């Protein structure tokens, strides 16, 4: 039995999230259907992180087990031939049977693209969150960055956890929150050991509230300490959220994600990640 690790990108706008569902309009269902057409047998996948409806991926990782002996390029080219244009394999590589896409991941990174201009941007529809602020208004990105400092380190993120979250513990370690402003655009990067269900979108709701001046930066620390979801801002829209990268022990030689074909090309290039 061979274990294969696979990296893929997808535009989540048209899908009901990653996880397989009866109506089958999910990334997992399209992927496993395409693998079956390529391999001639149904192969089940294990994923690094299940994304919600409307959430995208630049660096999703899966693994599968198979008796097929194919070159890595054959896996990529063959499966891509059956996938819709909004899903694409980027790489495939054989890995030791000890590799596990979910349980061996020690860091995950998410990006969020937020447009704050006074009108919609059709070419970014479904691929960015938006506020449509009046002309001349800007989010206070410095206040948002200041507020985010309380999130760093090992924290109990219960205040930013969805009610249906199945994680055993709300305690996670946040390594970095970075914001970059470029005209009407604000780009955010979140790096952590792992994330709770809706955690990034709930943090986005709070950071945007601070950026609009509805709360001072220190309010976010109060919400974090309270461990009460009712005190946080509403969950922000999924459109601008991207699973950007997943990191594994170096021994497995899992390729880093490539954001060059996305809204984030060059945004965080000179920052340590």
Swiss-Prot record:
tRNA processing among keywords: yes
EC number(s) recorded for this UniProt protein: 5.4.99.12
Residue ranges of coiled coil: none
Catalytic residues (UniProt): 52
Function: Formation of pseudouridine at positions 38, 39 and 40 in the anticodon stem and loop of transfer RNAs.
Family assignment from sequence similarity: Belongs to the tRNA pseudouridine synthase TruA family.
Record-given protein name: tRNA pseudouridine synthase A
Gene name linked to the record: truA
């Amino acid at each position: 039995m061979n274990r294969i690790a696979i990296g893929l990108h997808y535009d989540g706008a048209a899908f009901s999230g990653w996880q397989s569902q009866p109506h089958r309009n999910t990334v997992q269902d399209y992927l496993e259907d395409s693998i079956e057409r390529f391999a001639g047998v149904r192969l089940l996948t294990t994923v690094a992180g299940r994304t919600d409806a409307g959430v995208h991926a630049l660096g999703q990782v899966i693994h599968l087990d198979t008796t097929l002996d194919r070159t890595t390029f054959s896996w990529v080219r063959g499966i891509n031939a059956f996938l819709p244009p909004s899903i694409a394999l980027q790489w495939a590589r054989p890995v030791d049977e000890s590799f596990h896409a979910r349980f061996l991941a020690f860091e995950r990174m998410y990006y969020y693209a937020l447009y704050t201009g006074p009108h919609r941007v059709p070419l970014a529809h479904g691929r960015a969150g938006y506020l449509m602020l009046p002309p001349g208004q800007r989010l206070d990105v410095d206040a948002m960055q200041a507020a985010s400092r309380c999130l760093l380190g090992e924290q109990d993120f219960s205040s930013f956890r969805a009610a249906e979250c199945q994680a055993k513990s709300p305690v996670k370690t946040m390594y970095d929150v970075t914001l970059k402003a470029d005209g009407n655009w604000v780009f955010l990067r979140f790096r952590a050991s792992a994330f709770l269900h809706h955690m990034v979108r709930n943090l986005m709701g709070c950071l945007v509230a601070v950026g609009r001046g509805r709360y001072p930066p220190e309010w976010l620390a109060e919400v974090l300490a309270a461990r009460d979801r009712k005190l946080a801002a509403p969950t922000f829209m999924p459109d601008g959220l991207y699973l950007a990268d997943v990191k594994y022990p170096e021994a497995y030689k899992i390729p880093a994600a490539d954001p060059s074909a996305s809204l984030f090309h060059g945004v965080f290039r000179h920052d340590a990640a």
